[in-house]
Amino acid sequence: ILRRKKKDVIKELPEKIETNIFIELGDEQKKIYVAELNKVKEAIEEALNDGGMSKVRFMILPLLTKLRQICIDPKIVYSDYTSGSNKIDRFLSVIEEVTNNGHKVLVFTSFRTALNLVKDKLDSIGIKSYQIDGSVSSKERQTRVDNFNNNDDVKVFLIMLKSGGTGLN
């Protein structure tokens, strides 16, 4: 297995350009977020009263994760949600702008459901993409990377953070 660390390939990478774009939640999305936040507060308060900090410690990460997912798109958590997401809409407009200017894009996420949602949206607007998540074999990962690098029609590569570097040479 070959593994390349950032320090080994940093000279080959283009200069990093970072742009922060702040996006307000849409009205429906905000309602869902606030309702979920109130549930989180109640659950933590109840757990503190029942079992103290030791009980709360195991609850916090899943609760915060759910809030993060709602900020991306409530559809990730609630499959029947249909009102859309300002964040996903803005993301898609950036992807369209970048790919229309002849560039390719790597997209990383921690959430497979977000990856699948974005893949579906890209497909619906005619932007070809490849995806790597835990379900893709090492051989297929390398094939997708090679195809992405050599096929100008494929503009976006969607990658799960946990599986992005695994099985790639």
List where the protein language model places each region:
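Conserved P-loop NTPase motor "coupling/switch" region that bridges the ATPase
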Residues: 1-9, 17
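Cytochrome P450 catalytic domain signature, combining two hallmark sequence patches
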Residues: 39-46
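Conserved Helicase C-terminal RecA-like lobe
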Residues: 11-34, 48-168
